[in-house]
Regions:
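A domain-start/cap signature at the N-terminus of enzymes
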Residues: 1-76, 279, 283, 295-298, ...
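Short beta-strand element of the alpha/beta-hydrolase
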Residues: 74-85
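Alpha/beta-hydrolase
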Residues: 80-82, 172, 235
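Primarily recognizes the serine-hydrolase "nucleophile elbow" in alpha/beta-hydrolase
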Residues: 87, 141-195
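Short amphipathic alpha-helix adjacent to the substrate-entry channel of hydrolases
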Residues: 89-108
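The feature captures the conserved acid-bearing segment of alpha/beta-hydrolase catalytic domains
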Residues: 174-252
Length: 324
């Protein structure tokens, strides 16, 4: 792509540059639990031929790109959008709102709900962000990931695993709790950055009761995990539909707002740390008492629940228990 001076809507855009962030090593380390990442790495090492680190061939991929005509003084903001549909398209009515906020929009084709999450949807989103940043002046503090429905659930995974890239997430009618096998907690360093500097905007239609319930479960999870930057917005009069212009405008304004420090954050973090320590000691005690199978089961639960917060001790215990 050589279009740094091009604005407006561009279809069938082809990018050409790769980043280690979209490679298999980074994806497994950031988006899988430590034990699952260990299993994947061992399985790859056992192959007769090592697969390429990049699962996506950019020469075969197409993106839709929308660039506002007026570049903000600090550079553009960027919204990487993960769709539930297969077509690369800009949702109806969004262009004028993106203009007002100075936000570039990019979305990949063939990255909908039917596509593999780890091999396609997530690396395509990361590659989209990287290539737009190479060709346009982007304010790194205003790089966001978003999505609708199933795409919003993928966006949440990316926001959690890549808080050093994405500083906010627009969760339009799709979300999940974190801290389980599907959405594990990343390393302590990445998770701290997510807790303290990532804005999460939950935006769901007032009549979309199923996804409103999902949002409630997800927000309760964020509270349990001491995540500070959570905002809830309800779009009136609609069901399970992509956000209209007015609702999007409010959501994008909220993404840019600063996160107010929570005076209870330190106590909350201490509670989580105590729980990690207690569950780790539980595994150690089972090992000491010769209850190996129970220890393995407890280790799996520790890894699924606390992910990177239990590492590297969980990996050391896995070696001791010969967990594969």
């Amino acid at each position: 792509m050589h279009a740094a001076d091009v604005s407006g809507l561009q279809r069938n855009v082809v990018f050409d540059s790769y980043t280690p962030l979209s490679g298999g090593v980074q994806l497994t380390q950031r988006l899988l639990s430590p034990l699952m990442a260990m299993r994947v790495q061992r399985a790859i090492a056992a192959l007769a031929r090592t697969p390429p680190d990049q699962a996506v061939d950019l020469t075969r991929e197409k993106f839709v790109l929308y660039v506002p005509a007026a570049e903000p003084p600090q550079g553009y903001a960027l919204m990487v959008f993960v769709p539930p549909w297969e077509e690369a398209k800009l949702p109806l009515g969004w262009a004028s709102v993106l203009d007002r906020h100075g936000i570039i929009f990019v979305s990949a084709a063939n990255s909908g709900n039917a596509a593999n999450v780890l091999d396609r949807r997530e690396p395509l989103a990361l590659l989209a962000a990287y290539n737009v940043e190479r060709h346009y002046r982007v304010d790194a503090s205003r790089v966001y990931v978003g999505g609708f429905s199933g795409g919003a659930r993928v966006a949440l995974r990316l926001a959690l695993g890549y808080p050093d890239l994405f500083h906010g997430a627009l969760l339009n009618a799709g979300s999940d709790p974190i801290g389980d096998e599907q959405i594990p907690i990343p390393s302590a360093q990445l998770f701290r950055e997510f807790q303290e500097s990532t804005r999460l905007i939950y935006l769901t239609g007032k009549n979309d009761s199923f996804h409103l319930d999902q949002d409630l479960r997800s927000r309760r999870s964020m509270q349990e995990w001491c995540v500070e930057g959570v905002v809830t917005q309800t779009a009136p009069w609609i069901g399970h539909e992509v956000a209209e212009a007015a609702a999007l405008d409010h959501a994008l304004s909220a993404l840019r707002a600063p996160i107010a420090p929570d005076p209870q954050k330190q106590a909350c973090d201490s509670g989580v740390a105590d729980a990690v320590l207690a569950k780790t000691r539980e595994v150690q005690t089972l090992i000491a008492n010769g209850k190996i199978e129970q220890a393995r089961a407890a280790l799996q639960m520790l890894d699924a629940r606390y992910g990177g917060l239990a590492s590297p001790r969980s990996l050391e215990l896995a070696d001791k228990l010969n967990v594969h």
